């Protein structure tokens, strides 16, 4: 009860949803993000949050993704894909943290 539910139809939770409006109305400036899949929906949402000026933290051990082939067709493990997504944008769009840091506050 009292929670805002924001259904989404694209990979970013900000596209064609009222999420940004809700956050701004509530004066929320810092986001802590977790979810599936790191290299798709999570990354798209966090990129957009950064572009919109939110102070964004991605909880690395509260996200996961799936194995997939790279551009050359070599299969990359889910851990490799996850790690590359984290490394690509850490410090640019988000700050990577873990659940222990979240719980410490």
Where are the predicted features?
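Active-site-adjacent betaalpha module
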Residues: 1-105
């Amino acid at each position: 009860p009292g929670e805002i539910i924001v259904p989404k139809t694209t990979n970013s939770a900000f596209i064609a949803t009222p999420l940004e409006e809700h956050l701004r109305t509530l004066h929320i400036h810092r986001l802590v993000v977790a979810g599936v899949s790191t290299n798709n929906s999570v990354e798209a949402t966090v990129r957009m949050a950064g572009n919109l000026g939110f102070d964004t933290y991605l909880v690395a051990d509260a996200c996961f993704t799936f194995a997939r082939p790279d551009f050359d067709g070599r299969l990359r493990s889910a851990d490799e894909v996850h790690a590359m997504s984290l490394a690509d944008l850490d410090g640019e769009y988000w700050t990577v943290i873990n659940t222990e840091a979240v719980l410490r506050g």
